[in-house]
């Protein structure tokens, strides 16, 4: 197997899924979605959507041969807000931006020194930016703290995105104030119909790209597990749940990944994946934080 952190790093500029390596297999580049769901990528690859609008199965490689596995599309890093609104400045003090030269994923501050994000957002070097609203402007409220430890869930699966959760230990504690503070972990699982708040600096378009400078918010309900599984047959595990609208139009998107889904003041979800952004019958899929509360607490205790 060869993936973004293995023997072909030049092919993978950002977080991605593992691929089987074969002669002539090249990394796909983002292209336009064509009729029938196919997409044309780099090196002559014909691509078909698999998960998240980020990962595609290659039908043939650069030499015209059958590709051996899945190709992770470099998506400039990760997931999205479509159909939302600009958040009130510093109204979500738990929201963080993960930066590696530029913003690439979101996260949530759960204690003075720990952040929850998505495992597929993993990079070896991450700067956590707290107190942000406009990520292109220094507004005077920010705290930039490097990651001291980056810990993916031990059972994270890059192919299925199961257990898509990661902890980041800050090199020094955040200074808690009105603009930087923590969000509580869940005490009960997310109930269908509950209104939640999703936030991030991700793409605001279902087709094309428009990345905002200011933090975007989206109010959306938790869907039933039956609705979630019907939207993605065979792909929803017990660690995943769906939030959004089956009619489409509102969703998280690229570069929102790792960010928070907050319901009744508790961190219930982590932005994980979806098929496209804000497509009909393709709601966003989120990591169910409730399932990982014990792992989070045990990991923090073991790395304090």
Curated annotation (Swiss-Prot):
Comment on bound cofactor: Binds 1 Ca(2+) ion per subunit.
Entry EC no(s): 3.4.21.4
Main location: secreted
UniProt entry tagged with the keyword Metal-binding: yes
pH behavior: Optimum pH is 8.5.
KW Secreted (keyword) present: yes
Residues recorded with modification Sulfotyrosine: 211
Catalytic residues (positions): 120 (charge relay system), 164 (charge relay system), 257 (charge relay system)
Every Peptidase S1 domain range: 81-301
Reactions catalysed according to its record: Preferential cleavage: Arg-|-Xaa, Lys-|-Xaa
SUPFAM superfamilies: Trypsin-like serine proteases
One Gene Ontology cellular component: tertiary granule lumen
Pfam families found in the cross-reference section: Trypsin
Subcellular location: Secreted
Cofactor: Ca(2+)
Residues spanning the membrane: none
Disulfide bonds: 87-217, 105-121, 196-263, 228-242, 253-277
First-tier enzyme category under EC: hydrolase
Job of this protein: Digestive protease that cleaves proteins preferentially after an Arg residue and has proteolytic activity toward Kunitz-type trypsin inhibitors.
PANTHER family per record: TRYPSIN-3 (PTHR24264:SF48), TRYPSIN-RELATED (PTHR24264)
Family assignment from sequence similarity: Belongs to the peptidase S1 family.
Protein name listed in UniProt: Trypsin-3
Gene that this sequence comes from: PRSS3
């Amino acid at each position: 197997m060869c993936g973004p952190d293995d023997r072909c790093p030049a092919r993978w500029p950002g977080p991605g899924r593992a691929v089987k390596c074969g002669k002539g297999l090249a990394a796909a580049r983002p292209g336009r979605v064509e009729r029938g769901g196919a997409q044309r990528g780099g090196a002559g690859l014909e691509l078909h959507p698999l998960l998240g609008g980020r990962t595609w199965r290659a039908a043939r490689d650069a030499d015209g041969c059958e590709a051996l596995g899945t190709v992770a599309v470099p998506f400039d890093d990760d997931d999205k807000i479509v159909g939302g609104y600009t958040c009130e400045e510093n109204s979500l003090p738990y929201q963080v931006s993960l930066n590696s030269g530029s913003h690439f994923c979101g996260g949530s501050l759960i204690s003075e020194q720990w952040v929850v994000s998505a495992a597929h957002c993993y990079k070896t070097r991450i700067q956590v930016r707290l107190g942000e609203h406009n990520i292109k402007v220094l507004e005077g409220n920010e705290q930039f703290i490097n990651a001291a430890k980056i810990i993916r869930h031990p059972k994270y699966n890059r192919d299925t995105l199961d257990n898509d959760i990661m902890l980041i230990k800050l090199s020094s504690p955040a200074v808690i104030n009105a603009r930087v503070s923590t969000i509580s972990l869940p005490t009960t699982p997310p109930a269908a119909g509950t209104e939640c708040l999703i936030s991030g600096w991700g793409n605001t378009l279902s087709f094309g790209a428009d990345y905002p400078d200011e933090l975007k918010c989206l109010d959306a309900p938790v869907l039933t597990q039956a609705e979630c599984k019907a939207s993605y047959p065979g792909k929803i595990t017990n660690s995943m749940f769906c939030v959004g609208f089956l009619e489409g139009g509102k969703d998280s998107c690229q570069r929102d990944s790792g960010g928070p889904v907050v319901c009744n003041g508790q961190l219930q979800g982590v932005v994980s994946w979806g098929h496209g952004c804000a497509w009909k019958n393709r709601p966003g899929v989120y990591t169910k934080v409730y399932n990982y509360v014990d792992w989070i607490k045990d990991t923090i205790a073991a790395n304090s």
